[in-house]
Amino acid sequence: MSYLKTTMEDEESSKKNENDSNADSQCPSVGFFHKDHMQKSKTGDTCDLFPKWKILKEGKSSIREMIDTHTNAANIKLEQDDETSEKSFYPSTNTMHQTIPTEPNCTKQGEHTENINGNVHPAHIADKKLHKCDECGKSFKYNSRLVQHKIMHTGEKRYECDDCRGTFRSSSSLRVHKRIHTGEKPYKCDECGKAYMSYSSLINHKSTHSGEKNCKCDECGKSFNYSSVLDQHKRIHTGEKPYECGECGKAFRNSSGLRVHKRIHTGEKPYECDTCGKTFSNSSGLRVHKRIHTGEKPYECDECGKAFITCRTLLNHKSIHFGDKPYKCDECEKSFNYSSLLIQHKVIHTGEKPYECDECGKAFRNSSGLIVHKRIHTGEKPYKCDICGKAFSYSSGLAVHKSIHPGKKAHECKDCGKSFSYNSLLLQHKTIHTGERPYVCDVCGKTFRNNSGLKVHRRLHTGEKPYKCDVCGKAYISRSSLKNHKGIHMGEKPYKCSYCEKSFNYSSALEQHKRIHTREKPFGCDECGKAFRNNSGLKVHKRIHTGERPYKCEECGKAYISLSSLINHKSVHPGEKPFKCDECEKAFITYRTLLNHKKIHLGEKPYKCDVCEKSFNYTSLLSQHKRVHTREKPFECDRCEKVFRNNSSLKVHKRIHTGEKPYECDICGKAYISHSSLINHKSTHPGKTSYTCDECGKAFFSSRTLISHKRVHLGEKPFKCVECGKSFSYSSLLSQHKRIHTGEKPYVCDWCGKAFRNSSGLTVHKRIHTGEKPYGCDECEKAYISHSSLINHKSVHRGKQPYNCECGKSFNYRSVLDQHKRIHTGKKPYRCNDCGKAFNIRSNLTKHKRIHTGEESLNMANMESHSGTFQKMIYYEGGNSLDGTRMQMPVWEAEHAKSQRNQIEEKLYEYNNF
């Protein structure tokens, strides 16, 4: 019944009228009038027949000529609706009618006629078409028809709908269109009461009651009510498609097809479902959709009784019973019941995907695939379970769900006895027993038991993530992954670990976690025997053997075996970091890293160390920290067997062996193995900083360091020690400070066992063992193990000691002055816990403690092994040697000895301070 839509455009009605003269012989006119009626009044009498005339489809041209025959044409009111083809006349009382003389030789006298044209009988001029179109050569009887026709070539549409902005060629077309929005249906069938928007639709409908179909197709014998519909039908045989889309060039057999198609480009969907609000571009789409809600399935298979909502799906279904598949693919020889299915299938070989989603850009081979896909974005779930009311986006989803409910399940597996509601589900299940995996990925060759598994897998290669979290915007390749993720936002964690009481969203995640406690590693590598707690860990590991690196950086082309490695690598490139912290403006590549970072500002640290009570934001950080106490270093370098507490340190270390230096200076091009090394290096470039402090003019390389620096001026110290009340600008400084109270020294020297509160102290200390002195004086070429020692030394060359004591003594640094002042004040803040003795400097307390521990003080042999400069200890001006004997020496030698002693004391001071 698609021809019902043809009446929506005025050019269609003109097409109908144009073909009328050709169809007269075989298709009688629906409405007509006799010429004798025109002779009723010669002297101005009112025509009593005129108001009753209803000139139907083929009478439109007659009306125009009738106007010409009246002497007072201005008084005639013409209500002409091209769409409805209903013509009514209301002549005034003074309308004059002309007498039409008869011709003696006319054989058509006394017959019904359609046209009256002066003194010439219409039958003689029926075939004359005097008005020709310059564009296409088509001819028309009347100029008005030609003018109307020309609009098709110009494409002019002057009439616009206020509701949907749709445009039309004529006011009548617009008027009929507006009834879609208003819901007005003025034309009612007196047989069944059904109403229509246009008169022509009513006439078409009425033919269903009468059953009259007088216009027959010569090609196939099919009959129609009207010649215009027959003409449209004939284009199926001729292949003629005169209506072309100006946007994409697609052609159609009729204007209504073109009109509906154009809505794809305009996005117009005027037909709305009053149940769920979904909109459609055509009424037939809405009609079919409504059957989902009503459950109506009017098309029933006479073989098996199964019912369908559309005729097309019924026809597809029937092919199962017939087994007839006449349409064969010349590529793979697969056969189909219908040519349309073959055309759809061929797209697989061509790779063409003409149907694109306007939300995410995903393309599909057929419109049905696109329609189903769009439900992901709209959230539409039209398939509802009649038992529990749960709704689904796909009919297959509903079918799977129904198997949950108890009841008869006709399809039983002979292998395991499991039953299924549908045979398709049973067939899918059987592949578990047979091991059959017929669905192969054309990219990597991986096989799957079902098509849905392959579909999800393919998204790894395409990067498509259609399932988006409406809370944080993160996207996933499957619905189940999104569901797992949403548990984070809801805080739902019903599965609790009996070992450590940690909770999880899913039982599978809990099972995986428990293997940490049981140390179970069921997934073993066939190549090297290495075992893993989960399959994903094994998968990533196997890529080491195969050399596969599926995760490639689009910036530099470097590839990695895991996604996490790629994400870590991407931080090297100064590209886009879309996730910005609103507290400190620091930006991140992923939303997850931003969330982790935000916990710094919130101060949220729920994970506490049971040894030192230090708190952490994440369990992973707590686990890492605990290794400080246990001295566990599980990450071993496979090149040099050096061990590390965490994987990140091992990664950085491995770059020493590989020579990889991913962090490059954009000023001089020098590269480094770690980001921190690059930051340190950048400080050597003067005048290349981007972030300047407006208080003191000091410049920095990043906004983060500038923000940190500004706390100096603001005096902001948000991190307070609960033990002594001392405040710090940074949490890291507070953490270091707390170790004074706890006595914790987690950083232990591998050489001599000495422990330090922080890693920097250990780093400097180790240089005593290695003999490394990286800080050289540019004045005298003397070198030191620490930067502070170099600064102290440089004051010798400058001769400046800006920090003065009341006693007149001067010092290079405030810290040394503070230490000195304790001599005057008598303050001794460093107290021994064993005997209560107090000291003014920490190093003296450290030396004193060795009395209680029995630990020998640093002996000369040890010092010689580190410095390689002294053979024995010498005291100045006749001091005692180590064995207590008195030594005599010249004054110059004593001065030299004094200088050497000062150097050793400096070393001892540094050593004890660290």
From Swiss-Prot:
Keywords, comma-separated and alphabetical: Isopeptide bond, Metal-binding, Nucleus, Phosphoprotein, Repeat, Transcription, Transcription regulation, Ubl conjugation, Zinc, Zinc-finger
**Main localization of the protein described in the UniProt heading:** nucleus
Keyword field contains Transport: no
Q: Which residues carry this modification: Phosphoserine?
A: 881
Q: Please give the tissue specificity annotation from the record for this chain.
A: Expressed in skeletal and cardiac muscle.
Q: Please note every region of biased composition (Polar residues).
A: 90-101
Q: Record's Pfam families? A: zf-C2H2 (PF00096), zf-C2H2_6 (PF13912)
**Compartments it resides in:** Nucleus
Crosslinked residue numbers (Glycyl lysine isopeptide (Lys-Gly) (interchain with G-Cter in SUMO2)): 5, 57, 60, 77, 87, 577, 738, 872
Recorded GO CC terms: nucleus
Q: Which GO terms describe its molecular function?
A: zinc ion binding
**Residue ranges of the region described as Disordered:** 1-35, 80-101
Q: Where are the zinc fingers (C2H2-type)?
A: 131-153, 159-181, 187-209, 215-237, 243-265, 271-293, 299-321, 327-349, 355-377, 383-405, 411-433, 439-461, 467-489, 495-517, 523-545, 551-573, 579-601, 607-629, 635-657, 663-685, 691-713, 719-741, 747-769, 775-797, 803-824, 830-852
* Disulfide bridge map: none
Q: Which function does this protein serve?
A: May play a role in differentiating skeletal muscle.
Into which family does the record put it? Belongs to the krueppel C2H2-type zinc-finger protein family.
**Protein name listed in UniProt:** Zinc finger protein 62
Q: Which organism is it from?
A: Mus musculus (Mouse)
